């Protein structure tokens, strides 16, 4: 019998997840299908109960349901609970269990371009919203010991740092201070929407004085190279856009559902083609 998977969100028509997962199922000769479900906020509970009753094997959760979904699950993974958001649900033995693969997916993506373990790196996170929280907690869970957080509102950065129970040396900074101290970091991670299409001329931090070998990663993938990535590339940095995070978080969800590891490079090239790259 064909296994059913999917993604719920609103809006959902733009999602690249169906094409990515369905190609992986086909490539691995699996009898499964991944479908995008438009689910409005006021019917989230009914939708989740319906998916469970239909016997869906697993599903992803995107905007605006990543927090609200937690009220309708049987179990929540400890890291997802700490992050306060779920983006992947596994249906097994009659139970719906929630996970967050955004942060772990990002960590795997980052490690894929780093020649050294991330645990030895000094990291600067730009932004203190939901994406930053998922990445901060996942880096801490992976054993990274030095993570500073820069945000327009410094108090929000302080709140993020205070919420983490892992042993991490962290300082909350203004964006101005982070700009001055950028040369002291091994990795800079941009987690805000600043620089996203159509406001491509904006950047949260002017890149001017990076040290050699710095990695600059931006979770945005429209455009492929944001202003911060263009400036970092000019400085000789190793750069990474948000496609890697998207692919790795999806691959991790696929692995959780099926027990099979999909071809990451195949997924990545497919997404790039679909985005017009």
From Swiss-Prot:
Listed name of the protein: Shikimate dehydrogenase (NADP(+))
Domain of life: Bacteria
Broad class of enzyme this protein falls into: oxidoreductase
Subunit structure: Homodimer.
Residues involved in shikimate binding: 15-17, 62, 87, 102, 221
Organism taxonomic ancestry: Bacteria, Bacillati, Bacillota, Bacilli, Bacillales
One family name in Pfam for this protein: SDH_C
GO biological process: amino acid biosynthetic process; aromatic amino acid family biosynthetic process; chorismate biosynthetic process; shikimate metabolic process
Function: Involved in the biosynthesis of the chorismate, which leads to the biosynthesis of aromatic amino acids. Catalyzes the reversible NADPH linked reduction of 3-dehydroshikimate (DHSA) to yield shikimate (SA).
E.C. code: 1.1.1.25
Gene Ontology molecular functions: NADP binding; shikimate 3-dehydrogenase (NADP+) activity
Residues given in the record as NADP(+) binding sites: 127-131, 151-156, 219, 242
Family, per entry: Belongs to the shikimate dehydrogenase family.
Keywords, comma-separated and alphabetical: Amino-acid biosynthesis, Aromatic amino acid biosynthesis, NADP, Oxidoreductase
């Amino acid at each position: 019998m064909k296994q059913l998977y999917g993604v719920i969100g609103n809006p959902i028509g733009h999602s690249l997840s169906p094409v990515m997962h369905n190609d992986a199922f086909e490539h691995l000769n699996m009898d499964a299908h991944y479908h995008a479900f438009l689910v409005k906020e006021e019917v989230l509970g009914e939708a989740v109960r319906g998916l469970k009753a239909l016997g869906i094997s697993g599903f992803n959760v995107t905007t605006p349901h990543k927090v609200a979904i937690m009220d309708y699950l049987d179990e929540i993974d400890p890291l997802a609970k700490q992050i306060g958001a779920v983006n992947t649900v596994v249906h097994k033995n009659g139970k719906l269990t929630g996970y967050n693969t955004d942060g772990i997916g990002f960590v795997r993506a980052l490690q894929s371009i780093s020649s050294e373990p991330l645990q030895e790196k000094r990291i600067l996170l730009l932004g203190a919203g939901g994406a930053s929280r998922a990445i901060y907690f996942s880096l801490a869970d992976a054993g990274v010991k030095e993570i500073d957080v820069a945000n327009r509102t410094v108090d929000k950065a302080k709140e993020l740092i205070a919420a983490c129970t892992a042993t991490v040396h962290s300082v909350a900074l203004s964006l101005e201070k982070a700009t001055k101290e950028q040369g002291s970091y091994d990795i800079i991670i941009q987690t805000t929407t600043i620089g996203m299409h159509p406001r491509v001329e904006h950047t949260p931090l002017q890149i001017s004085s990076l040290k050699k070998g710095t990695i600059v990663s931006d979770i945005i993938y429209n455009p492929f190279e944001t202003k911060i990535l263009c400036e970092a590339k000019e400085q000789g940095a190793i750069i990474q856009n948000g496609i890697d995070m998207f692919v790795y978080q999806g691959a991790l969800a696929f692995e959780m559902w099926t027990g099979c590891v999909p071809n990451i490079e195949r997924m990545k090239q497919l997404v790039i083609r679909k985005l017009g790259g």
